[in-house]
């Protein structure tokens, strides 16, 4: 009980410090508030998308090595509500974050980059991800459902990266950018899982739910996706 209270007190203290820093930053540099909220919202949403991808792949392939770790990626999508709040604040209260809300766009680009359609699409992405999380956390989640989730993630992840990030510079387009961002989401999720597993082992060395082999598998997966992300970054740079 004492340890739990100490942990909760530490979390509250860090949360209070973060809140003070956020408020100070918002007051001192108001022009940075929108971009910073967007960065935080996209990062939290990316953690959820990467975790959903990991879980869906495990179900589709019938992998058993990660069964005792499934709770971690199943809990990561809990960041989606906070991501939704942050992103909606940007879209509704700080539209100046996107230059196309000020500059008039013409043709199909003008239709696609209209605020109502943009907000509706973003809400659809977030809603589908929340639904996918509910479907994958069911005890009897089938490989067919997981395959459908992978298809949804591929389409919505590609569109979300284009809408939320690439449209910051509407004159610039790239066919590989969305893939690069999606792989970055997976890297973030696997890294969060690995850090959580290490934290569990440090706090409870006798815990058998996280084995050395599982840590090595997660580390190998993190290295592989990091190399892929770096390769895509280089391709994007070139």
What is each stretch, according to the model?
Residues 30, 34-37, 42-49, 53, ...:
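Residue-level signal for well-ordered alpha-helical segments
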Residues 34-41, 69-71, 170-183:
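Non-cytosolic membrane-interface motifs at loop->transmembrane helix junctions
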Residues 1-52:
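N-terminal regions that are enriched for targeting/export leaders
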Residues 41-142:
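Transmembrane-helix bundle segments that line or gate the permeation/cavity pathway
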Residues 2, 6-7, 29-32, 36, ...:
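Serine/threonine-rich low-complexity intrinsically disordered regions
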Residues 38, 57-58, 177, 216:
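Residue-level detector of alpha-helix boundaries and kinks
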Residues 4-16, 20-21, 115-238:
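Long, contiguous internal "core" modules enriched in hydrophobic/ aromatic residues
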